[in-house]
């Protein structure tokens, strides 16, 4: 899948390692999966891609996914190819993903004082105590100086 790859996220599920990566096969980016028993030797999943750009806001692709396991529900946070928003998809098996109907849940206009007015990219989610934090890169407006932003959300 794709002519090159970018960004990855690895989780351990059912005694296997699942590696999610962005496959760059222009004109559209997609998220693919490779699986390993030992975390060293990976085999591409034959049903790739596991996440495609099928919503209007996703434009020419999806990528840079990061995965969280919350009580057996996998959550993938990903961005669109033009770096204008983030989406979320859920799965119970790591292969079949359901996108939220609230996507994009975060966009460039969601940032404080619009400081990332041009791009938001590379979402990374960390749970600290009872708080879920979304870290991301942002730049703008029109400066192209990468900055790190954070969004806090209390868990239920």
PLM feature spans:
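Carbohydrate-active catalytic/glycan-binding domains of CAZyme proteins
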Residues: 1-156
């Amino acid at each position: 899948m794709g002519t090159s790859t970018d960004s990855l996220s690895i989780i351990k599920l059912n005694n296997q390692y699942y590696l999610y990566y962005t496959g760059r096969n222009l004109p559209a980016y997609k998220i693919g999966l490779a699986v390993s028993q030992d975390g060293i030797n990976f085999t591409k999943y034959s049903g790739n891609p596991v996440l495609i750009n099928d919503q209007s806001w996703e434009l020419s692709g999806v990528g840079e996914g990061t995965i969280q396991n919350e009580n057996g529900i996998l959550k993938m946070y990903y961005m669109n190819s033009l770096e204008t928003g983030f989406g979320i998809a859920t799965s119970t098996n790591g292969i079949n993903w359901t996108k939220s109907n609230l996507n994009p849940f975060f966009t460039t206009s969601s940032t404080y004082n619009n400081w990332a007015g041009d791009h938001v990219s590379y979402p990374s989610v960390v749970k600290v105590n009872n708080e879920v934090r979304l870290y991301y890169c942002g730049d703008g407006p029109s400066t192209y100086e990468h900055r790190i932003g954070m969004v806090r959300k209390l868990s239920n």
